[in-house]
Regions:
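Boundary/activation segment at the start of structured domains
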Residues: 1-33, 37, 41-43, 60, ...
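Hydrophobic faces of stable alpha-helices that mediate helix-helix packing
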Residues: 31, 56-60, 165-169
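Active-site flanking loop/helix segments enriched in acidic
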Residues: 33-58, 150-155
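Alpha-helical phosphate/pyrophosphate-handling elements in metalloenzyme active cores
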Residues: 45-81, 94
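Divalent metal-dependent catalytic cores for phosphoryl transfer on phosphate-bearing substrates
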Residues: 72, 76-174
């Protein structure tokens, strides 16, 4: 068991100071909520590394290693904030179907697709070019649905990942 742990530090402090007990209660509830929400990141970004609760825990582990015994100097609100930051920073990577539809319907997104045709990322560039070719001519291949899904996933991931910080902020503020 780790000697220095942010969660245990917050719990111990809140157990000793009744006026802070709500902090630990909200952290516990929000950790569960965020963990469930972050499971959905894999649906939009299957080609990325995991961005679920295990990713948040890995971040916390690194922070705990860096802070060491200085964790004991953190106030309960600072500890609460660090814990939440580790879990909430990728909430903006969870994209709802409605948001996808809205994005794909905007002129801004069409301009983004134009930019991607010149992308240095070969897979992304080819995904856009292929979708445009499909739109123009159609594809008779048996595997076209799989290629369409893959192409759209690459484009969606690139578009929404670049905005995930502001989307995380908006999600938290809702």
């Amino acid at each position: 068991m780790d000697e220095h742990n942010l969660d245990r530090h917050l719990k111990a402090y809140c157990d000793m100071h009744e006026e802070y007990q709500n902090l630990y209660a909200t952290w516990s509830l929000n950790r569960k909520s965020c963990s469930e929400i972050l499971k959905n990141v894999l649906l939009r970004y299957p080609h990325y590394s995991l961005h679920d609760a295990s990713h948040a825990e890995a971040i916390l582990s690194k922070i705990e290693m860096l802070l060491g015994d200085r964790i004991e100097q953190l106030s309960p609100t600072a500890t609460w904030l660090v814990l939440h930051a580790a879990y909430a920073h990728d909430l903006g990577m969870v994209v709802q179907w409605r948001e996808l539809q809205e994005a794909w319907s905007t002129p801004k997104f069409k301009e983004y697709l134009d930019l991607l045709t010149e992308s240095e990322d070969k897979d992304l560039r080819e995904a856009v070019l292929w979708l445009r070719q499909m739109e123009k001519n159609g594809d008779k291949s048996v595997l076209w649905p799989l290629r369409a899904v893959r192409s759209v996933q690459l484009i969606d991931a690139a578009y929404f990942r670049s905005q995930h910080a502001s989307m995380s902020k908006n999600y938290i503020e809702r």
